Amino acid sequence: MINPELRDGRADGFIHRIVPKLIQNWKIGLMCFLSIIITTVCIIMIATWSKHAKPVACSGDWLGVRDKCFYFSDDTRNWTASKIFCSLQKAELAQIDTQEDMEFLKRYAGTDMHWIGLSRKQGDSWKWTNGTTFNGWFEIIGNGSFAFLSADGVHSSRGFIDIKWICSKPKYFL
């Protein structure tokens, strides 16, 4: 008969208890190591991609300023029809977020009036066509419900008059 005790006095079952724990710890260690490697590779890839990201040029009749493309119509329509036109171009009536945008739009629009993407219901605050509330950083002159840009600033009117319009959409990065 074989003696189940080893020379140091421990039972043979000791090895059967320790080996599975060693294998389990080894697997956990390997998984942690692989997780660190995968995370590091992802961070490096994202950082490299971000450095090489370039804005796509605005196409056709669209003009690029900063991170936006603008379209100035030659045709005239009411505010709602202008909004629909912009939507069909995957754009919105122009949203003016900065003084730089405002100066560019006024300079390019010249003396013509152009619908922009601000409207309000009677007694409500002004909202952009994307649903965000206008923060009031420029004055809107008049008591109408639809905003338009002219050479001397932003005015409001009833939306049924036919004037030119400006669409805007973001430049997309690749």
Curated annotation (Swiss-Prot):
Effect recorded for residue 152 to A: No effect on affinity for KLRF2
Q: Which gene encodes it?
A: CLEC2A
Q: Which residues lie on this side of the membrane: Cytoplasmic?
A: 1-27
Q: Give the originating organism.
A: Homo sapiens
Q: Which residues lie on this side of the membrane: Extracellular?
A: 49-174
Supply one GO molecular-function term: carbohydrate binding
Pfam families reported for this sequence: Lectin_C
Q: What is this protein called?
A: C-type lectin domain family 2 member A
Q: Can you quote a single GO CC term? A: plasma membrane
